[in-house]
């Protein structure tokens, strides 16, 4: 198989090797001498070589390299989100980079079965060499979580605070502290959603119209239920309608919503939740097509991280059972299983949007002005003006 970036002889035509003035070679550019010599097998150093230790090391090093790439993409996305007004080209770039993160996470999920080719006895042969090293000590994964938006108060505390394992590394503590204090992707997405066009009370006032539509829908359903001949069926339907009225109250009453946020059941601000619901309802409008794709990708990221955690939990249970402590002193399987809860879903509110959907026929119709604002098609006067301004720059 040929090299993907060039001929090993330095000449793409198969001639003589070029001198150093022609540029670095493949191995030099990728610094493969360092990368491929970084697999230090402690079992070999102890004169008790264990074959599967090499697989364990390579797999986890691959994880760390991909974590580094995800962090690189996240930092660039957060930078693009930091401006108050985002051009369409920026949204496209954000979509591209979010999709790249999704593809990487899919790869990481599929990487777990490779480790599972190792049996529990194989792992036991070199497990003692790992202590006190543990995946709990992966600095990059903690940075990744913080940059996405996992809050300290939502983390499960088992035996120790997540940052305490880095106490001997001041640089690591400083990096974690920075990511805890700077705006996460979730913070920036919320601010972006709060600016969703159509939420203005002196404009389209989507939220007011949505609340009216919900009240009308529930009133119609209540009237229909009252006509039910069978008393038990009527009571069941009325009880169901009342439950749904309470559910909708949790989004229409800002104080109820804020209480749910304080309790950790919701993450988004009230205004950001309004924006997410509006984008979901009018996702077929040109201006909301890309924002809706963006919300879908954020949920994909959350879903894939949860799948990766789950695969990791199952693998750990297969390797060491559910009672042993992890090599780093954590509670092992019990701790990992606890991270599967919704506490670790950064964009949990996006998953729960379907709770508040209403039939298409009940969705508030767009006014002519709002229809025009959300339908900036190619060739429209507004779009042409933007193109002229862009060309003049």
Swiss-Prot record:
Stimulated by low concentrations of hydrogen peroxide (5 uM), ascorbate (0.1-0.3 mM), and sodium hydrosulfite (0.1 mM). Inhibited by high concentrations of hydrogen peroxide (0.1 mM), ascorbate (10 mM), and sodium hydrosulfite (1 mM). This is Tryptophan 2,3-dioxygenase. Pathway: Amino-acid degradation; L-tryptophan degradation via kynurenine pathway; L-kynurenine from L-tryptophan: step 1/2; Pigment biosynthesis; ommochrome biosynthesis. Heme binds at residue 312. It is an enzyme of class 1 (oxidoreductase). Its EC number is 1.13.11.11. It comes from Aedes aegypti (Yellowfever mosquito). PANTHER family: TRYPTOPHAN 2,3-DIOXYGENASE. The lineage of its organism: Eukaryota, Metazoa, Ecdysozoa, Arthropoda, Hexapoda. Belongs to the tryptophan 2,3-dioxygenase family. Keywords: Dioxygenase, Heme, Iron, Metal-binding, Oxidoreductase, Tryptophan catabolism. Optimum temperature is 40 degrees Celsius.
């Amino acid at each position: 198989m040929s090299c993907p970036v060039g001929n090993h002889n330095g000449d793409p035509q198969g001639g003589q090797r070029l001198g150093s003035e022609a540029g670095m070679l493949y191995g030099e550019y990728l610094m493969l001498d360092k990368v491929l010599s970084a697999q230090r097998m402690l079992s070999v150093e102890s004169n008790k070589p264990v074959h599967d230790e090499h697989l364990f090391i390579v797999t986890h090093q691959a994880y760390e390299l991909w974590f580094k790439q995800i962090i690189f993409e996240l930092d660039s996305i957060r930078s693009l989100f930091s401006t108050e007004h985002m051009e369409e080209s920026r949204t496209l770039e954000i979509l591209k980079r979010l999709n790249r993160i999704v593809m990487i996470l899919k790869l990481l999920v599929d990487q777990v079965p490779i480790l599972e080719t190792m049996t529990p006895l194989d792992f036991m042969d070199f497990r003692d060499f790992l202590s006190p090293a543990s995946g709990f000590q992966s600095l990059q994964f903690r940075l990744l979580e913080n940059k996405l938006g996992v809050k300290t108060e939502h983390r499960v505390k088992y035996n120790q605070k997540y940052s305490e394992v880095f106490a001997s590394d001041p640089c690591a503590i400083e990096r974690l502290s920075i990511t805890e204090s700077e705006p996460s992707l979730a913070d920036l997405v919320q601010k972006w959603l709060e600016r969703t066009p159509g939420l203005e009370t002196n404009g389209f006032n989507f939220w007011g119209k949505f609340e009216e539509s919900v009240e009308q829908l529930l009133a119609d359903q209540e009237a229909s239920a009252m006509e039910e001949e069978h008393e038990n069926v009527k009571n069941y339907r009325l009880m169901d309608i009342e439950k749904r009225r309470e559910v909708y109250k949790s989004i229409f009453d800002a104080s109820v919503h804020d209480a749910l946020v304080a309790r950790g059941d919701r993450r988004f601000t009230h205004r950001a939740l309004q924006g997410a619901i509006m984008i979901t309802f009018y996702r077929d409008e040109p201006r909301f097509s890309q924002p809706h794709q963006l919300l879908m990708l954020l949920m994909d990221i959350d879903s894939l991280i949860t799948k990766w955690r789950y695969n990791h939990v199952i693998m750990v249970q297969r390797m060491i059972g559910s009672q042993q402590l992890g090599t780093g002193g954590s509670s092992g399987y019990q701790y990992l299983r606890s991270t599967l809860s919704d506490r670790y879903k950064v964009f949990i509110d996006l998953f729960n949007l379907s709770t508040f959907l209403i039939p298409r026929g009940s969705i508030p119709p767009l006014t002519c002005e709002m229809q025009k604002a959300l339908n900036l098609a190619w060739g429209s006067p507004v779009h042409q003006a933007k193109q002229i301004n862009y060309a003049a720059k």
